[in-house]
């Protein structure tokens, strides 16, 4: 579940509560006391905790009863002071407005009281996770995402839990869900699409170097940061696979590669296929193999029945065609995506690529 929010970058400064004026959502979340161990066998989540970074608070508000919140978002390169390691409870946070709602719970804008740190707090109900049998998926998501550090991957700072809920402390992405932005505009121009593709390729290259396969890249799982940069946000279907060979069927139908539809083993190159589908959807407004029925969609995917509208440039068609190849080894590597002439000519990425520095180590 990625949170759904498309808002002005400065709008997250509003509607935080003081302890004396807790919101209804905050009062509900406070009902259950923190417990030091999970109460169900399946809730034994990751033992290691990542430390939460600190944002310096703004000057105090002159309005009685209101908490002033800085409107400045830190640079990815800013060296943030680390909070002391400690256990968190819901009482450590001011709870703001809801950012999104999903099958297993909700996401709220939140601020850690001691350090005034702005984040998104994802609240999941244990009963729902157990009912659907997805505890292992959440456990895997926490273990993987909490260890990734990349400007185009949403940070997971920490997690805690009480008797009924699990709370994930996530980086707040002020510009919200990319899918909502795509719906708003219908399709993106070449400049924006190429920028997103460079950012995505760099983030996926970082993941693949660490033997992490995402397996579910799509607009719904991407958020946008303060400067509009892409952030991979949902690692629910991701896997840490040192052998990089898997056989599990997962992901979204329109984005499934041929090898997964045919039940073959797959590796990190499934993400290359997804990147090609995503680039097409950015530029056209719909996935390339979209069809009235699942059967027809499957047929078009395994036959790579790729049709381009006339308004696409030769450069963009070349990139998409090199990613959407039936045989995984023939797909353009992620470094090739970042260095593709169409990407280099159109991308306006602000941050330098990370893959260059990781390769030199």
From Swiss-Prot:
Its cofactor is Mg(2+). It is found in: Nucleus; Chromosome. It is an enzyme of class 2 (transferase). Its EC number is 2.7.11.1. Residues 93-343 form the Protein kinase domain. The keyword Nuclease does not apply. Pfam families: Pkinase. One of its GO terms (cellular component) is chromatin. One of its GO terms (biological process) is mitotic spindle organization. Transmembrane segments: none annotated. One of its GO terms (molecular function) is protein serine kinase activity. CDD domains: STKc_Aurora-B_like. Phosphorylated, stimulates kinase activity. ATP binds at residues 99-107, 122. Keywords: ATP-binding, Cell cycle, Cell division, Chromosome, Chromosome partition, Kinase, Magnesium, Metal-binding, Mitosis, Nucleotide-binding, Nucleus, Phosphoprotein, Serine/threonine-protein kinase, Transferase. Belongs to the protein kinase superfamily. Ser/Thr protein kinase family. Aurora subfamily. This is Aurora kinase B-A. It comes from Xenopus laevis. The lineage of its organism: Eukaryota, Metazoa, Chordata, Craniata, Vertebrata.
